[in-house]
A protein has these predicted regions:
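Acidic glycine-/aspartate-rich tracts in secreted/extracellular proteins
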Residues: 203-210, 248-250, 257-261, 279-281, ...
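Extracellular disulfide-bonded cysteine-rich modules/repeats
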Residues: 196-197, 240-243, 270-273, 305-315, ...
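Extracellular receptor-binding modules and their adjoining Ser/Thr/Gly/Asp/Asn-rich linkers
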Residues: 240, 281-322
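Low-complexity, small-hydrophobic/phenylalanine-enriched stretches
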Residues: 242, 248, 253, 259, ...
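C-terminal accessory segments
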Residues: 231-236, 246, 254-255
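Extracytoplasmic Gram-positive cell-surface binding/anchoring modules and repeats
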Residues: 262-268, 368-371
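Periodic small-residue-enriched repeat registers in elongated scaffold domains
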Residues: 1-228, 236-239
Length: 375
């Protein structure tokens, strides 16, 4: 053992103490600096008041302290208090097994937790806080960025002032905020407040998961009647929503591939598919089996009165009733018929049967040898 300095003390085998009142009191222990102390096997203390109290631990810096085996404290008043803990920086504190604190005032207080950055804090098991004043308090949580906060299990917050406070939630972007289970937000000040939702884009937010299998009042182009539509593949299978804006801010989603169109499809469709559906949604009007007009979804069929007819259109349940009436008084150029009966009077190819009725107001007929006029 070797001791150099006033009141230096080296009592362990191969121990070394150098400095005023230094102590190396275990085998292979080394203490360097006034009042430095190495009190465990293979421990090293370097700096004024540094203290290495556990086997193979290293304390470097004024008042640095190690209390865990194979731990390391580097920096003024740094502290490594558990096995294999590492504290680097002024006031850095790693108090749990295999924890790491790097940065002035950084603190890692849970198993395998890592805090990297000035005043960063990791207090959840296997959590990681990266950035000045970042916080990771949930198990397996990740907070990256100045003042980022991940406070629940498996939560991820990346970006300055980002916040993730729900299980399995992810917030990516400056001041992004997610508070619902398994929700994801990406973008500056994006917000996610509904479970399993995905919010994309700066200032976007998610809406409530309100899924209804029946749309009760779906109408097209302002038609007077409405259509009830039933959807397959919805309701019970819905897990969340994807938002790219909020109530006031909207975005286009471009270059979308054509989705499958079936009775059970849940694919997104693009503008060209909607255009074709709209274009083909009308119908043709024929005249004696010949197309004469195309009526699109916002078109109209107009029924007009004729010379001797009158059209009446009445509203029905998602339908219209069309009645064509013959006027009481009609005007025709000629009538061709094999038989005509008016009351008791019958006119046909065999002659006129007056039905025992008078024929009045007969004009004077011509009286001649070949006349066929009535007289």
């Amino acid at each position: 053992a070797s001791a150099f300095g006033a009141n230096a003390n080296a009592t362990g085998s191969t121990a070394t103490a150098i400095g005023l009142a230094t102590k190396a009191i275990a085998q292979s222990a080394s203490a360097f600096g006034d009042s430095a102390s190495a009190s465990a096997w293979g421990a090293t203390a370097l700096g004024v008041g540094a203290s290495a109290k556990a086997d193979n631990s290293i304390a470097v810096g004024s008042a640095a302290v190690t209390e865990g085996r194979e731990s390391t404290a580097l920096g003024r008043r740094s502290y490594a208090g558990a096995q294999s803990a590492t504290a680097l920086g002024t006031g850095a504190n790693a108090s749990a097994i295999v924890s790491t604190a790097v940065g002035n005032g950084a603190k890692a207080s849970a198993f395998q937790a890592s805090a990297l950055g000035n005043s960063a804090e990791a207090s959840g098991e296997s959590s990681m806080a990266l950035g000045t004043e970042s916080r990771a308090s949930g198990s397996d949580a990740l907070a990256s960025g100045s003042n980022a906060n991940a406070s629940s299990m498996n939560a991820v917050a990346v970006g300055k002032d980002s916040n993730s406070s729900a299980v399995n939630a992810i917030a990516l972007g400056t001041s992004s905020n997610v508070s619902a289970i398994s929700a994801v937000v990406i973008g500056t000040q994006a917000k996610g407040t509904h479970e399993n939702s995905v919010t994309l884009g700066s200032y976007s937010s998610s809406a409530a998961n309100d899924f209804n299998q029946t749309a009760k009042t779906l109408s097209y182009f302002g038609d007077k009647s409405s259509v009830t539509v039933n959807y397959n593949g919805t309701s019970s299978t819905q897990k969340g929503a994807v938002s790219v804006g909020d109530g006031k801010l909207v975005r286009q989603i471009q270059n979308v591939g054509a989705g499958r169109i079936t009775d059970k499809s849940t694919d997104a469709v693009n503008g060209s598919q909607l255009y074709q559906a709209y274009y083909n949604a009308g119908f043709n009007i024929q005249n004696n089996k010949t197309d004469t007009s195309r009526i699109n979804t916002n078109g109209k069929v107009n029924f007009v009165n004729g010379k001797n007819t009158e059209v009446v259109v009445t509203d029905g349940d998602n339908a219209a009733n069309i009645t064509v009436n013959l006027k009481d008084d009609i005007e025709v150029t000629s009538v061709k018929a094999n038989n005509l009966t008016v009351g008791p009077v019958t006119i046909n190819k065999d002659g006129i049967n007056a039905g025992d009725k008078k024929i009045t107001h007969v004009s004077n007929g011509t009286i001649s040898a070949d006349s066929q006029d009535a007289v």
